[in-house]
Each structure stands twice: as C-alpha cells, then as structure tokens.
Amino acid sequence: MRPTLRCASVCLAAILGCALLAPAATEPSIASGNIDDIIRTLSGRTDAGSLNLLSRAYYAIEQFDNAITAGEKAVNLQPNNSLYHLWLGRAYGEKAAIANPFSAASLARKTKNEFEQAVKLDPAFVQARADLSEYFVEAPSIMGGGLDKARDQAVQVAKYDEATSHWILALIASKDKNLAETESQLQQAIKVAKDPSQYWMNLASFYSHHARPDDMQKAISQALAQPNKSAETYYNAAGVLFQSGKNFPAAIEYLKKYLNSGAMVEDAPAFRAHYLLGQIYEKMGNKPDASAEYKASLALASGFAPASKALGRAQ
C-alpha cells in the first residue's frame, strides 16, 4: 500500500494488520489475487455485499473512481454497515491523495465523514478508529485534522485493543518529530499485542525509515520468530527490505514463502506479491525474472497499471 492520507508518516500504516470481515466462503477472495475473476463475477450483481467486495477489488488495483462508484452503491443499500463506510472512506482517501487540490479538499472531507460514520455505527470497530486516527494525524486542521483528536481516539481504542492504541500514539509522536517517543510507543505495542509480529514489522519499518539497518534486521528476525505470526509477515518483511535496499535475496525468499503459504490476505493479495517480487528482481538487474513476475501479476489483475508500466520498463 502506498503512502497516502491514510498512511502514517513513519510508514507504519501499510503494515498494521486489518481485522476486517472476510468475504463469505462462496464469494471470490481478493487475497487470492485474481482480481479479474472477481470483477467478472461481481460486476452484474446489485446486492450490497457484492458491491462492497467489487469496490475493494477496484481499490486493490488502484482504480479508485470505480471503487468509489461501487462503494457508494453498497453504502446506499446498507447505510448502517460500518465496514462498508470504512471501505468507502478509504477509496475517497486514496482518490484525494492523487486529485487536484480543489477536488482533494472535498474528497478528504468525505473520507473523514465515512470514517466517523463507521465508528459511530460500531464504536468497537478498532480498524475504523485506526483509520480515523490516521486521518486526524495527517489532515490539516482546516479539513478536520488534529493531533488532539487522534489522541482521543487512542484513548478510546485502548478499551478494545491496547496495541493499536500505542500504534496511534506512535503516529502522533512521529508527526511531532519525536523519534524517541515513536520508538517507545512501538515497543510498548509489541509488549501488549496478541500478535506481536505485525508490530515488530512496524518497528522494522521505523528503523528502515530512519537508517538503522541493524536494528531493522533484528526487528524483522523477531517478527519472523513469532510462533503465531501470519503468513503476511513474510510479505511485509520483503517490503521493508525492498524499501531499505537491503538483503534482496532474503526478500525474494520471503515472498516465495508467502505465495506458497496458502494463507494470503486481502492486504497483500497474490498479484501484489508478484509485483513486489518483480520490483526486487528489477532492482537487482534481473530483467527476465522481473518481467515474468510482472506478467504473473497482470495475469491476475490486468487492470493494475503499475505492473503494466513496470513490464514495459523491464522488457
């Protein structure tokens, strides 16, 4: 996931695990990465659940206009569904990040409204509160942002998930350029997390961002050593190594483990894993393998423009 209004200033948001509702077993899975199949299957449907999943499929391939269209329809059909408001808010937020300033202001307000509605409908929905907190941290006050508002969310989230509360406080500290407090809050999140692996990866991302490669590698090793880690940890580890420019062979190994795990998740669908693998090969100067991975990504998600552009570059 790219840094956007929804992403933390210390590049942590891309790694925070999303405790979202999974699609029903009879529905196609975004995690499998076959976005083309999902879009073909769902495009003719008019029920709210299908429209929400369709919106998320478009969101995954960064077609945010289509994601907004489907997401708005889902919300209109089921206005009391917190999850649908969350995903519509995300689509608005990503669109705002690439829009012209006039449009971005309107979209940002819509983002905030959807996140707030998601929280209002389900006060215990930790991920909605986390996304709203990110908005408050990143948005200017004229658009409803504010660190005090984010701090209030951290207090509210602590009732349900202490680790996420510390993560929000880390975002705030980072925005204040208080690196020691950022690191401390991330370390506290690790201590109280049910799944410490994702928070070790947050810490690894922080170390990478601040040119502490040895600490980064130690944090990655700790994440991968957790007995209850999700397979996504391998994907995230590869992403941090790629961004740091370090240990590409290990990053390749981690991505292959993830792709072979049979436990992929929506935040890291297969087509994105192939795309990241292609990026790593390209950085290594291995254009044949890079091209093969970009083609594998496009075979699952033909509308994913970054892979198309990368393939043209690698061939």
Task: Describe the residue ranges of each PLM region.
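N-terminal leader/linker segments that initiate helical-solenoid repeat arrays
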Residues: 20-65, 69, 83-86, 315
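Structural motif corresponding to the intra-repeat A-B loop/turn of tetratricopeptide repeats
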Residues: 32, 61, 95, 139, ...
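Canonical positions in the second alpha-helix
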Residues: 41, 45, 74, 117-118, ...
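TPR alpha-solenoid repeat register
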Residues: 50, 84, 128, 165-167, ...
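Residue-level recognition of tetratricopeptide repeat
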Residues: 56, 90, 97, 134, ...
